[in-house]
Amino acid sequence: MMLVELLSGVISCVCALLAVAFFTLLERKGLGYFQLRKGPNKVGLMGLPQPLADAVKLFTEELVKPTLVNVFPFLVCPAMSLFLALVLWILYNNYFVCSMGGLSMLLFLCVSSLGVYSVMGAGWFSNSKYALLGSVRAVAQSISYEVSMSLILMSCLLLVGSMSLSMIMKYQFFVWVAFVNFFMMLMWFVSCVAETHRAPFDFAEGESELVSGFNTEYGGVGFALLFMAEYGNILFMSVLVISLFFGGVVFVGVFGMGLCVMVSFVGWLFIWVRASYPRYRYDLLMYLIWKSYLPSVLSILMFLVVSVYILNG
Amino acid sequence: MVTILIYLLILLIINVVLLLLGLIINKRSYSDREKNSPFECGFDPSIHTRAPFSMRFFLLAVIFLIFDVEIILLLPLTSNILNSNTHWPLTSSMIFLTILLIGLFHEWNQGSLDWMK
């Protein structure tokens, strides 16, 4: 049993790495077509092997270590952020995959909070002004949205009475939580976009203000690892959007392919949002979470607690 | 538990191998003073690279700390409310959430949530 669990975790982690590679291709292609151009189409057949070429290029690229950098933590931070992004994938529930035990969402909360440290370290140990400013912004944004995210997560788990992701997916066999918790679902998606520092909330690397934000000093392998971690987080957030609010799809389709299709669609939504909206304003971002989401999430949570208690008898 | 530990170990190995791979096969090249200085637009960086930042960010972290502790206290509620026969999970969580909400409105009223004054 243990071996099977371990094997399924490792397989979903390796598949996640592959998915990350091709998700970057999807993003470049998609953004290309949004802007009425082709995107990468020269490598191989229609640009399909492009991610592999990118990987080779990034790993063989020269590694610049600026003199002021604290070298060891500077190199460890990207590896740590990829590590944390991949740890989450053991929670992935597919048709074939046996999930981890009853406290999987607790593991998610812990690991996703730790992700802040790698961003903070990447900025701080770079010893550069742009990197520091970018990482400070990124940390403030992440921790703010973490509050509302954990409360929304709790509102979903409340309906099931368990902290296990596989349990909440099983409970949605007949009806989706999205029907009960519709506004929570919308808020969860926006929080996910903000938590992963994606456009329109990409203040961690606002190109026009800070050169590239917290990863300004990175190139080569460091940049590659940070990039993979970011996209791994995006894909896992898409998985969570589907698992928490549309969990029943794991039973739909041949071998549960419904889940993969829905997750790809949510991943596509991240790109779509990026192509459609201009960058938000930082103070508005903070108002959105503290003055709008947090009071409404707390109120809805109170309502849910009472209704669950009454309906439970 | 053991499964997760072994999984973490495997991931650690994957990450270290990726990092070492990048460190070993990267293209060597010359390095000079300009190239190795932190990225700033064409001039030498001043000494204070780790510049002081706005107090807002620190205050935000303090507020976050309070809310995060409260979330930790709320987490057991998820399994208690369905699995208990008494009204205590309901009553205590309602009192707790009300205090949390009033606390948030108090912060708002006092202006600690305002990003720009």
Curated annotation (Swiss-Prot), chain A:
Q: What is its EC number?
A: 7.1.1.2
Catalytically driven reaction(s)? a ubiquinone + NADH + 5 H(+)(in) = a ubiquinol + NAD(+) + 4 H(+)(out)
Q: Name one Pfam family in it.
A: NADHdh
Its localization reads: Mitochondrion inner membrane
Q: Output the InterPro entries linked to this UniProt entry.
A: NADH_UbQ_OxRdtase_su1/FPO (IPR001694), NADH_UbQ_OxRdtase_su1_CS (IPR018086)
| Cellular component, GO, one term | mitochondrial inner membrane
Transmembrane ranges? 6-26, 71-91, 105-125, 149-169, 173-193, 220-242, 255-275, 293-313
- Keyword vocabulary terms for this entry: Electron transport, Membrane, Mitochondrion, Mitochondrion inner membrane, NAD, Respiratory chain, Translocase, Transmembrane, Transmembrane helix, Transport, Ubiquinone
- Give an example GO biological process: aerobic respiration
Protein species of origin: Heterololigo bleekeri (Spear squid)
Its biological function?
A: Core subunit of the mitochondrial membrane respiratory chain NADH dehydrogenase (Complex I) that is believed to belong to the minimal assembly required for catalysis. Complex I functions in the transfer of electrons from NADH to the respiratory chain. The immediate electron acceptor for the enzyme is believed to be ubiquinone.
Q: How does it sit in the membrane?
A: Multi-pass membrane protein
PROSITE patterns according to UniProt: COMPLEX1_ND1_1, COMPLEX1_ND1_2
Predominant localisation class: mitochondrion
Q: Which family does it belong to?
A: Belongs to the complex I subunit 1 family.
Q: What class of enzyme is it?
A: translocase
Annotated GO MF terms: NADH dehydrogenase (ubiquinone) activity
The protein in question is named NADH-ubiquinone oxidoreductase chain 1
UniProtKB/Swiss-Prot annotation, chain B:
> Is Zinc-finger among the key words of this record?
no
Describe the family membership recorded for this protein in Swiss-Prot or TrEMBL: Belongs to the complex I subunit 3 family.
Cross-referenced Pfam families, in alphabetical order? Answer: Oxidored_q4
A single GO cellular-component term on record: NADH dehydrogenase complex
Q: What role does this protein play?
A: Core subunit of the mitochondrial membrane respiratory chain NADH dehydrogenase (Complex I) that is believed to belong to the minimal assembly required for catalysis. Complex I functions in the transfer of electrons from NADH to the respiratory chain. The immediate electron acceptor for the enzyme is believed to be ubiquinone.
Keyword annotations: Electron transport, Membrane, Mitochondrion, NAD, Respiratory chain, Translocase, Transmembrane, Transmembrane helix, Transport, Ubiquinone
Its UniProt entry gives the catalysed reaction(s) as: a ubiquinone + NADH + 5 H(+)(in) = a ubiquinol + NAD(+) + 4 H(+)(out)
Places the protein is found: Mitochondrion membrane
Q: Which species expresses this protein natively?
A: Heterololigo bleekeri
Give the EC class as a word: translocase
- Which InterPro entries does this chain map to? NADH_UbQ/plastoQ_OxRdtase_su3, NDAH_ubi_oxred_su3_sf
Q: Name one GO molecular function term.
A: NADH dehydrogenase (ubiquinone) activity
Q: What is this protein called?
A: NADH-ubiquinone oxidoreductase chain 3
